[in-house]
Regions:
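Structural motif corresponding to the intra-repeat A-B loop/turn of tetratricopeptide repeats
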Residues: 36, 63, 68-72, 127, ...
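Amphipathic alpha-helical repeat scaffolds of TPR domains
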Residues: 22-31, 55-65, 94-131, 144
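TPR-repeat structural position
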Residues: 39-40, 73-74, 132, 136-139
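Bacterial N-terminal signal peptides
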Residues: 10-18
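TPR/TPR-like (Sel1-like) alpha-helical repeat modules
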Residues: 67-93, 143
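Canonical positions in the second alpha-helix
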Residues: 49, 83-84, 149
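Short coil turns that delineate tetratricopeptide repeat
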Residues: 54-55, 89
Length: 149
């Protein structure tokens, strides 16, 4: 038979584990905003979550991918990736489903967005032959995307 003391200790242990494993209210609010595609609210709460959880490398990755990359703010995205790498590159995090290390997430997203920008630049460059009248505009846009890549 379990004594009251052992039941109390088991409940106390369970509650303490739940509290340690939970994200902050700020990060939970930001994740909920992302699920609802409320980008303005997410961009408001993710920096707050970073302030409350400065040792959580998942938050800067999410901020970089879901807010900065979405808005083509590449310098800010890279800054967030560097922040996450500085916290703990080996920590396993969950971003958009799979659990991977911070260093793998940074590598994957950097490569993905580089390829995306490069391909947009190639498409703009190809348009020069299709519409020579707009050659300067297409060339300028292509150069812009190649620089971003």
């Amino acid at each position: 038979m379990l004594t009251k003391k052992s039941i109390f200790l088991a409940i106390l242990f369970t509650l303490s584990m739940i509290m340690v494993a939970c994200s902050s209210q700020e990060y939970t609010t930001a994740k909920l905003a992302l699920q609802q595609s409320d980008w303005a609210k997410a961009s408001e709460w993710l920096p707050k979550a970073m302030a409350v959880e400065p040792n959580n490398p998942e938050i800067p990755i999410v901020l970089g991918v879901e807010i900065y990359a979405k808005d083509s703010q590449w310098a800010n995205m890279v800054n967030m990736f560097e922040t996450a790498m500085g916290i703990n590159p080996e920590k396993v995090i969950e971003v958009r489903g799979p659990f991977i290390s911070v260093k793998d997430a940074v590598s994957n997203y950097t490569e993905f967005y580089w390829a995306q920008e490069f391909n947009i630049g190639v498409e703009q460059f190809k348009k020069i032959q299709e519409g020579p009248d707009n050659k300067p505009d297409y060339l300028e846009t292509a150069i812009f995307h190649f620089i971003n890549a």
